[in-house]
Each structure stands twice: as C-alpha cells, then as structure tokens.
C-alpha cells in the first residue's frame, strides 16, 4: 500500500514538473526567439494600436494608431535618427502617406525628437502629410542653448511651423479641451471610434 502512495505521488510530481517545464519553454520561445520585431500591436476590429520600437538603444515614446482609414501618430520618439525606423513601420499601414492626426504630448526629447528631425533623418512632419496637429500648451523648454545654438525644442518648433505652412491645422490641447478656435475636445476618427483630448496642466 505504501508503494502505491509513493507511485501516485511520483506521478503527480512528474506531471507537475512536465507542465512547469512546458510553460517555461513556451515562454522562452515566445519571448526570446519568436517574438515579432517592430513593437507591440493590439488589434480589435477597425482599431489597431502599435507601440513602436524606435530603432535605437534609447527609450522614448511613439505610438501609431490605425482607426478605420484614419492614421494617428502620438509622439515621435527619442532621437532624430529614429524617424527612419518609425516611418518605415508606419508605411506598412499608412498607404496614402497622410497622418490625419499627429499629437505631441509634451516637449521632452524622448517625445519630440522625431518631429525635430536632423540633416540625415527628416522630421516626421516632412515624411508624411499631416492634417491636424495637436500639441501641448505649456513647456519650460528653451529655444537656445547657453552658447546661443538652437535647442532640439527650437528645431521642433521650426518643423511644426513648416507643417502648418504646408497646410496642417494646429491646435493646442487646451484649445481642444475648451472647444476654441475650431478645435474639438472629441474627434470622431472612424465609425464609432472617438478620440478625446485631455488637458492635465
């Protein structure tokens, strides 16, 4: 009788260990071997949200949203040279070259560097036709360095103005929240999909 208990216990333990090893192997394969490159994508019906890898070793934010036929870019990453990778990723989904909405959440480098661009890597404003640009209302960023050179923020402002001169409509988040000057707090971006602009300053 004691032998049966030992055999049953050993069988249960063996099954449990096999299960744990199987889960660990599957996790390892997905995480380190078969994981798709380019960032994470979440898709539901006509809405897909892509958290993009930026093509460099720096952290930064850049989110692409596809809502029906509407293309939305939120922030443009950590370095100006990340626009090559970011634009190539977006081009897979944005086939007409038009970003209906571009949003810059705040003026820190890890959010606006791709909008500023560089000599070797054009701004996201140059790479796509931008229809509506929504930006932060306040910043403590300076236009010049102590030595008098333009800052990244100054380059961003120049690129933003060029996009507006090329036909983009520009609103601040505060204008959107207050429904001022043609701005809206809520934009219908696709059938049944709305984008609400929040203002938290």
Predicted regions and their residues:
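Hydrophobic alpha-helical membrane-insertion segments, chiefly the h-region
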Residues: 18-30
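Conserved beta-strand hairpin/beta-sheet module of binuclear metal-dependent hydrolase folds
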Residues: 39-97
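Divalent metal-coordination and catalytic microenvironments
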Residues: 65, 75, 106, 133, ...
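Flexible, acidic/histidine-containing loops and adjacent segments that form or flank the divalent-metal
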Residues: 15, 30-57, 95, 117-201
